[in-house]
Design a protein with these regions (language model features):
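Glycan-recognition and catalytic regions of carbohydrate-active enzymes
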Residues: 131, 138-166, 177-179, 183-233
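Conserved alpha/beta catalytic core and glycan-binding cleft of carbohydrate-active enzymes
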Residues: 2-156, 160, 169-173, 207, ...
């Protein structure tokens, strides 16, 4: 093995423009890949009320349909809700439309479809019911991300409720839009994130290197059971 390259972590953003540019799941063993299908499924489930439990479970268990081949394990799936482009987590529950006028492109830049929900009010609000709903959805998305099988990727600032005021293409904003304001951090959201990370570290079952199975052709016991809220199968 190469003395330098063998010690590196290889992570792909597995898509590009043009024919054949989308290559999710096609990288060889040793690589980990951003999983945009995880992102889209989780956003649709929590924010749009779309999708089914089977699809949710498939992503929650590290997307075996994309990565369970050639000896690849569940850690190959880099799960994320938000990334460097697109809405931040707070903006994801606060805006249904991009607000990119400050970028100087007449609000034509940035993706127009974000699978977001503003909880009834576009942008900032003082309505306590809307704020409570937004906070609950952020916690739900963070909990799903940090308790899923696979490799979690958390956008810097999402743990403190950072907002870009609806700008979903802030690459050119070297100012308060993108700078993290720690003195204004959402302390409750940060505490929640810390507890979730501690839980993930404490329990190896939440970060397994082997695939979960609901049944086994070999007669071995299943490694996971999916139950209703009341505990029934």
């Amino acid at each position: 093995a190469d003395p330098l390259l063998s010690r590196l972590k290889w992570i792909a953003e597995p898509w590009d423009i043009g024919a054949g540019g989308y290559q999710l799941g096609a990288f060889p063993p040793g690589w980990r890949e951003w999983n945009d299908q995880y992102r889209d499924t989780l956003r649709s489930w929590w924010l749009l009320g779309q999708g089914d439990r089977g699809g949710f479970a498939h992503r929650f268990a590290a997307s075996s349909g994309q990565f369970h081949h050639d000896g690849r394990g569940p850690l190959a799936s880099v799960n994320f809700i938000c990334a460097h482009d697109g809405f931040t987590l707070r903006d994801l529950v606060s805006h249904e439309h991009r607000h990119n006028a400050a970028n100087g492109e007449h609000n034509h830049d940035g993706h127009p479809h974000n699978a977001s929900w503003n909880c009834g009010v576009e942008g900032d609000t003082t309505d306590p019911a809307v704020l409570a709903l937004r906070h609950r959805l952020q916690r739900a998305l963070l909990a799903t991300l940090l308790l899923s099988q696979g490799t979690p990727m958390l956008l810097a600032g999402d743990e403190i409720g950072h907002s870009q005021q609806g700008n979903n293409n802030a690459y050119c904003q070297d100012n308060a839009t993108t700078r993290l304001a720690w003195p204004a951090a959402d302390a409750a959201l940060l505490a929640c994130t810390r507890r979730l990370l501690a839980l993930r570290r404490r329990h190896p079952a939440l970060r397994q290197a082997c695939w979960l199975t609901g049944s086994s052709d070999t007669g071995a016991a299943a490694t996971v059971r999916w139950l209703e809220p009341d505990g029934s199968p």
